Amino acid sequence: MNQILPNSFRSGPDERGHFGIFGGRFVAETLMPLILALEKAYAEAKDDPAFRAEMDGYLKHYVGRPSPLYFAERLTEHFGGAKIYFKREDLNHTGAHKVNNVLGQIMLARRMGKPRIIAETGAGMHGVATATMCAKFGLQCVVYMGAVDVDRQQPNVLRMKALGAEVRPVTSGAATLKDAMNEALRDWVTNVHDTFYCIGTVAGPHPYPMMVRDFQAVIGQEVRAQIMEAEGRLPDSLIACIGGGSNAMGLFHPFLDDSSVAIYGVEAAGHGLSKLHAASIAGGKPGVLHGNRTYLLMDTDGQIQEAHSISAGLDYPGIGPEHAWLHDVGRVEFMSATDTEALDAFKLCCRLEGIIPALEPAHALAKVGDLAPPLPKDHVMVLNMSGRGDKDLASVAEHLGGQF
């Protein structure tokens, strides 16, 4: 803990987009006017009751919010400790939490008069959500996706194409999420006049980390109300998986100033922390990537290392800057789960709850298996079930040799 504790953990970022030493906006000169225009447009939209009312209407009638808070009775019984609840973001339209943020950004793009939307995607869920909203609002959609992810997430590639998006496979680097984001940024620099870049996580240059967090905070806001109804009090702990970290930030942020609530973020440990992994907090150091300063996987020369996770949505070599800050000030405890642990949790959830989770939240569920058993039976733990696992079935079957 090497930074001064604030009066509130929810007051950041400052006017230049910093969370302590993290965040900021490190962008090409060409993009700076656009970034400043975006910041201004977002500030105006946030203060406009009509924008909020329109967004709430779509969240209710199109996305299907509020998503349920579900007591996972058999998993609770299996672990024999804490009471486990799932926040069912997998039941949203498009199958994950991504749509909460995309709706907000696409409404903002319309407000700014930008007819062309670009996005990056890893697991494909952000791409699907962006393609969905572009179809709904009649906007052109281009999605950049690493060629490796195109291969392992075919169902989502087909969904994007069915929705009218152009999917551009990226073959540079490791051909995964980082490389897709690089290409999207290149496109944006070239087409600033008519293009809006819809970033899928709490990363990128300010105001993106703040904006994406605000659009995702509906998750935690609903949990506060739902857990009061179910248990009559706030939860004792929250847990979520973290790649860039938007699903986690959406759950965590409304609870950051509740000191009684323990908060756990779970990174992807891949083949193990001494081998190939995607755990930026556990194995990284501060550096600058994609417009912000955060913890990154880097070699001794400061070059970005390739991340690995069985989950296409977690294999990013960085983490959102607000998460980096929350780690440094000690408000959130970060842990990591390996590919094997995530697969075991995936199978357990399928068999005990009749819920096929995405491999991303399966990482968080793996750590629930470590945390929950020794806790008292009245301890209330909420896991963010951030997406459904249809997209991962072929990949899981391949890893398990076809034997579920």
Swiss-Prot record:
Keyword Signal: no
Catalytic activity entry: (1S,2R)-1-C-(indol-3-yl)glycerol 3-phosphate + L-serine = D-glyceraldehyde 3-phosphate + L-tryptophan + H2O
Cofactor: pyridoxal 5'-phosphate
Enzyme Commission number(s): 4.2.1.20
Modified residues (N6-(pyridoxal phosphate)lysine): K98
Oligomeric and partner information: Tetramer of two alpha and two beta chains.
Protein name: Tryptophan synthase beta chain
